[in-house]
Amino acid sequence: MSSPFLWRFLSFTQKYRGTLLAVSSVGLFAANISYHVAPEQTFRKLYQGWSKGEPVQLTAKLQGLFQEVLEETHMGVTSSYVPFSAFGFHPVSAGIPWLPSGCLIGIPFNYNDTEQDGVGIADRVLLINGKEVDWSSDAGTHLRQALNLSLDAQKFSLAREVFYAQGNSPIIQASAAPVCLSGICLSSVAIKQLLGLYSGPILLRGVYNMAVVVLGFAGYFLCSDAVSQWLDYQSDRKVAAVSKSYATGGIEFYEKILAQNRILRTLMGKQGETMYSPSGNLFPNDYLRLKNAPYTSRRDRIKNALLQME
């Protein structure tokens, strides 16, 4: 009984393959871009910082710092970028500036204190593997130093998120999946026709289709990761080109991230060894993918850019 259904299904997909490909591509793009289109309803709910059951409001100091970054980076319409207080220790962003919803930039609360203040985050409770970090211990002291950033490093990290959104990076990243899907489907059909597989045995076509699926996934992973890394490098390059202070801030920012990860690798034990490399880079979740550019590579590229500016 399944055979007639299978033949009807194959006939349907063969007849409407163009429409199915278009709908699938649009669906993939919509799924990947959804939280950038409505960041207030999706992204902010995930990253909003909370304290005592209430959302943490961004301080006047951080609002002033963010406006200063927008002015120094010469962003045209500053109202398109909306900052808010986010949890964590690094800035996050989502949204597209030219859309009505704009772009949200999440600024961590610890940015209220800088390396120059000498305060840092020692007054906050940080739990790692269910245990509170002792800020007076050697590991706690080094972690506190790694989490405290200078004003230049804070500016770099915020400008990086602004440039990432300003360059339409979310759209480019979301386009990788539908472009790969369309490319694989169209090329596989062309190769089938070229080799005459449509008139060949159905088993041979099945083996060919399975090979196309495997190669398609591998190609998507490589393409998506390459695009992601290129966007990371592009954002860093643009920010480093603003001024020498931004470039030096970028070097410090990535060095501090590497230092944080090395300390977390020690504090988290076996779990930390699976997440962070001895250098401080993130280990990929699987062996086939490297979604983000290594921090050491991003730092070294900024160093080279700084040398060219001198």
Swiss-Prot record:
The gene is tmem177. Residues 1-17, 192-201 are mitochondrial matrix. It comes from the Eukaryota. It is found in: Mitochondrion inner membrane. It is a multi-pass membrane protein. This is Transmembrane protein 177. Its main location: mitochondrion. Plays a role in the early steps of cytochrome c oxidase subunit II (MT-CO2/COX2) maturation and is required for the stabilization of COX20 and the newly synthesized MT-CO2/COX2 protein. The chain crosses the membrane at residues 18-38, 171-191, 202-222. InterPro entries: TMEM177. Keywords: Membrane, Mitochondrion, Mitochondrion inner membrane, Transmembrane, Transmembrane helix. It comes from Xenopus laevis (African clawed frog). The keyword Transcription does not apply. Belongs to the TMEM177 family. GO terms for cellular component: membrane; mitochondrial inner membrane. Residues 39-170, 223-310 are mitochondrial intermembrane.
